[in-house]
């Protein structure tokens, strides 16, 4: 074989390997996306079971304004449900108390200090 032929074969092989790598990466990304969608659907289903409609509505409004707080409260509620600590559905008043507790626990305290010269 001549050098140009070898170079052509090498390039062809490299292109084929790159194509396979890209396909496998795309497949992994798609699988991760599907897995996240399934997990999110399971979270929503669990929250539907443990929250009253009014509480779900309030949590949705909180999610619009403060997504991190809503996520923390959802995690807390799901943890309570999974450990069997919830005996009945959480109503709006109970959710308000939980929101306040989690908000107070995660609130950052800011202090402004002035340095005098």
UniProtKB/Swiss-Prot annotation:
What is stated as this protein's family in its record? Belongs to the PDCD5 family.
The answer, when asked if DNA-binding is one of the entry's keywords, is: yes
Tell me the superkingdom of the source: Archaea
Q: What is this protein called?
A: DNA-binding protein MK1619
Single GO molecular-function term?
DNA binding
Q: Which GO terms describe its cellular component?
A: cytosol
**Keywords, in A-Z order:** DNA-binding
Tell me one Pfam family matched here: dsDNA_bind
Record-linked HAMAP family: dsDNA_bind
Q: Which SUPFAM superfamilies match?
A: Double-stranded DNA-binding domain
């Amino acid at each position: 074989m001549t050098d140009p032929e070898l170079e052509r074969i090498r390039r062809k092989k490299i292109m084929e390997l790159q194509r396979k790598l890209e396909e496998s990466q795309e497949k992994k990304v798609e699988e991760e996306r599907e897995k996240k969608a399934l997990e999110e659907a399971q979270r929503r289903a669990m929250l539907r079971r443990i929250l009253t409609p009014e509480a779900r509505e309030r949590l949705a409004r909180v999610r619009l304004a403060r997504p991190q707080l809503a996520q923390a409260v959802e995690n807390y509620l799901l943890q309570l449900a999974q450990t069997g600590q919830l005996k009945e559905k959480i109503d709006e008043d109970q959710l308000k108390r939980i929101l306040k507790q989690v908000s107070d626990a995660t609130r950052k305290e800011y202090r402004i200090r002035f340095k005098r010269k």
